[in-house]
Regions:
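Bacterial N-terminal signal peptides that target proteins for export
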Residues: 1-9
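Bacterial Sec-dependent N-terminal signal peptides
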Residues: 3, 15-57
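Short, ordered, surface-exposed loop/turn motifs in non-cytosolic proteins
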Residues: 46, 66-92
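Exposed beta-strand and adjacent loop surfaces of beta-rich binding modules
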Residues: 56, 74-76, 118-122
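A short, amphipathic beta-strand motif
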Residues: 57-65
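Short, acidic Ser/Thr/Gly-rich low-complexity loop/linker segments typical of extracellular
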Residues: 84-108
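A short, solvent-exposed beta-strand micro-motif common in secreted/extracellular proteins
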Residues: 105-131
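Structured interaction patches on ligand/partner-binding surfaces of diverse proteins
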Residues: 124-157
Length: 157
C-alpha cells in the first residue's frame, strides 16, 4: 500500500510539473527593434512588426540657379512631392551651401514611409505661372535627411 501511495504521489508530481511548464508564458517584450524606426522600443526583445518609418528631404538651390530663374522671369517657386505642396519661396532666396533638414527658411519635407524604409516621390518645382522648371524622382530613406540641390541649366519659357 505504501508503494502504491509513493507511485501515486510520484506520478501526481510529474503531472503537476508537466502542466505547470506547458502553461508557462513567453515573457519576451515585443515591439519595434529597428533603430531606424521612430517607433523603436529599446526594451523590445522580439520584433512584432510595429516599426514605422519617416524620412526627410531638404530642397535647395544656389545663387547661379537664383540668378537664372530671375533672368527667366520667375519670381516665386512652389515645391511639390507626389502632387502635394511642401513649400514655396521667392526665387531671390538661395543658399550658399546645403542646408540641414528643418533649417529656418529651408524647403524641408518630412514624409511618413509607413512600414517601408525607402519610398520614391516625384519632385516637381513650378514658378508663379505654373511653368515646371524641375521634375525628378527622389528616394527618401528612413531616419535620414536627403539634401537635394536643384541645378540650373538655361531654360526658356
Amino acid at each position: 500500500m505504501k508503494k502504491i501511495l509513493s507511485i501515486f504521489i510520484c506520478f501526481s508530481l510529474i503531472g503537476i510539473l508537466s502542466f505547470t511548464n506547458s502553461c508557462k508564458k513567453d515573457n519576451k517584450i515585443k515591439g519595434c527593434t529597428d533603430k531606424d524606426s521612430y517607433t523603436y522600443n529599446s526594451t523590445a526583445q522580439e520584433d512584432d512588426g510595429s516599426c514605422l518609418y519617416q524620412g526627410a528631404v531638404v530642397i535647395w538651390y544656389d545663387q547661379a540657379a537664383s540668378t537664372g530663374l530671375i533672368a527667366d522671369g520667375a519670381t516665386a517657386l512652389t515645391f511639390y512631392l507626389s502632387g502635394e505642396i511642401v513649400g514655396s519661396t521667392a526665387t531671390s532666396v538661395y543658399w550658399t551651401a546645403a542646408p540641414a533638414c528643418g533649417d529656418n527658411a529651408s524647403i524641408t519635407a518630412t514624409e511618413d514611409l509607413a512600414k517601408v524604409k525607402t519610398h520614391a516621390y516625384t519632385l516637381s518645382v513650378k514658378d508663379q505661372t505654373g511653368y515646371e522648371y524641375w521634375t525628378t524622382v527622389l528616394n527618401i530613406d528612413a531616419n535620414t535627411c536627403l539634401q537635394f540641390q536643384l541645378l540650373w541649366s538655361a531654360r526658356k519659357k
